[in-house]
Every structure is written in C-alpha cells, then in structure tokens.
C-alpha cells in the first residue's frame, strides 16, 4: 500500500523471478491524478500546491506540468527538512505574487524533471493504470496501479480472494 514511492520496489521484486509461493497485495495510488481530480471538483479555492518530494523523486517534477497548464495553479516540489519546507513556501508565494503558474523544484538535490527513469520503466512493465478508490473521496479515474495479467499469479487478492473495501 502506498504511492509512486513504493511501487518500484514491488515492480523490481516481480521482475526478478520470485518463487511461485510469493505473493503481493498491492494498492498503489497516484498523486497527479488525485490533484487533478480535487481541482476538478471546484469546491475549494487553492492558491497552489507544495508537492511531495519523495513521490517526485520517482515521477519527476514534469509529471505535474499538465496540472499547472490546465488549472493555472502554481506548484513547488519540496523536500522534508524544515529549510526545504520554508523555501518551498517562499517559492510558492513568489509565484502567486508574480502571477506565475508553473512547477518549480525546490528539492533539486533529489528530484529531476524526468524522475527516476529506471523505476518508471519497471512500473510500466509491471502495472496498468486503473481507476482507484481513495478513502474519504471515492473513485478517482486513472489514479492507481493494478498488476498486469502476466503478474497475476503473484496477486494475493486473486490467490486468496481478498476483496478491497475503502480503507
């Protein structure tokens, strides 16, 4: 269970020929579609987003560009150290004040525009993007990962008939 940050380790494990009795119970959710969905509701006035640094190390800062272009909202990828957060807030406020709506990367020591290309390639080989249920929100289109058919023999939800309910 997790986001783009934890999916590469699941993918890498499955790509390395685990034993037949190995199973995974996956519920990986995707951040950009969730942000897009929340903005589409039009119920909350937001001035910008501080984007998660660890997720962004995998997907890259470019993964959020379509959101700024579509919704005209500033976004800043920030790390988790106190100074990272403060600089991220400063960068976001500066964009708001200057009327800019783009994705900036405060967390340059860890996040690249393209993200972790190898991790993304592994995820693409192992997972399909599907609609997913989010606790307290409901189903968000194209916001989750499901194991591709070729990896279903490792899917614990199928092996052991485990039904997911909203957590």
Predicted feature locations:
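Internal helical hairpin/lid segments
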Residues: 87-167
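Extended interaction regions within the primary functional domain
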Residues: 1, 9, 45, 158-165
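Weak global preference for isoleucine
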Residues: 1, 31, 35, 50, ...
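Phosphate/pyrophosphate-binding betaalpha-module
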Residues: 3-63
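A conserved active-site cap/scaffold subdomain adjacent to cofactor or substrate pockets
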Residues: 25, 42-112
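Alpha-helical scaffold segments in soluble metabolic enzymes
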Residues: 8-16, 33, 37, 66, ...
């Amino acid at each position: 269970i997790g986001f783009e940050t934890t999916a590469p380790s699941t993918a890498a494990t499955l790509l390395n020929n685990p034993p037949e009795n190995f199973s995974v119970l996956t519920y990986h959710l995707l951040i950009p579609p969730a942000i897009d969905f929340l903005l589409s509701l039009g119920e909350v006035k937001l001035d910008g987003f501080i984007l998660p640094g660890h997720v962004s190390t995998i997907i890259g800062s470019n993964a959020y560009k379509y959101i700024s272009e579509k919704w005209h909202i500033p976004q800043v990828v920030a790390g988790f150290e106190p100074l990272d957060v403060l600089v991220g807030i400063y960068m976001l406020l500066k964009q708001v004040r200057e009327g800019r709506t783009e994705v900036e990367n405060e967390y340059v020591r860890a996040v690249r525009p393209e993200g972790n290309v190898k991790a993304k390639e592994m995820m693409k080989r192992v997972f399909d993007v599907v609609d997913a249920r989010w606790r307290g929100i409901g189903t968000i289109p194209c916001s989750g990962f499901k194991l591709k058919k070729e990896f279903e023999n490792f899917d614990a939800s199928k092996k052991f008939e485990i039904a997911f309910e909203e957590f």
